[in-house]
Amino acid sequence: GSEMCIRDSSSAMHGLILLDEEKTPLSRMITWADNRAADEAEKLKYTVLGKEFYRQTGTPIHPMTPLNKIKWLQNSQPELFKKTAYFVGIKDYIFYRLFGELISDYGTASGTGYFDIHEFQWAEEVLDYLNIRIEQLPQVFPSTYQVTGLPSKTAAELGLPNDISFVLGGADGPLSNLGLGAFGDTCLL
């Protein structure tokens, strides 16, 4: 038989995990389905600022996005917001647990509402609005980025060789579109 030598990864978009300085979760993950940020989204949606954020990030102003979840957190749970050292998604956190690196891919980052899809970097104007810094977010790489070198204990627990490569992969939405062939300059479904 052949051995697995590479793993790909994917996750649901729009989730938010709040980490402390030691990168330990401060609460349960806030999933895409959590609508507690509806008021924040509604306040921002039709403003000049909201339209600019949409132009820059390509992400509609909606309660499911981490953009509005963070604003909701500031307004409803300011003490928890102050304790939060890092704002990450589920896949970002899993890669941290596996390899000790906070990293994300462009597709997953694009669903946050604070990633500039034109410059392929975190959107500083949106981060200013949220009162967060780039250092509180994962480093962002193309979906083809590979990480190799599982710690021996982790590799043994997972039954994987420690020299296996993990491909950063993407998020469910962008990968679904890719699988359907819905990409390119002139393709619309």
What are these regions (language model features)?
Residues 179-185:
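Alpha-helix C-terminal capping segments
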Residues 90, 186-188:
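Acyl-thioester C-C bond-transforming condensing/cleaving domain
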Residues 52-171:
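Gly/Ser/Thr-rich active-site cleft segment
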Residues 9-47, 79:
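Glycine/Thr-rich phosphate-binding loops that ligate phosphate moieties of nucleotide
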Residues 1-6:
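Short, small-residue-biased leader/transition segments that mark boundaries at the very start
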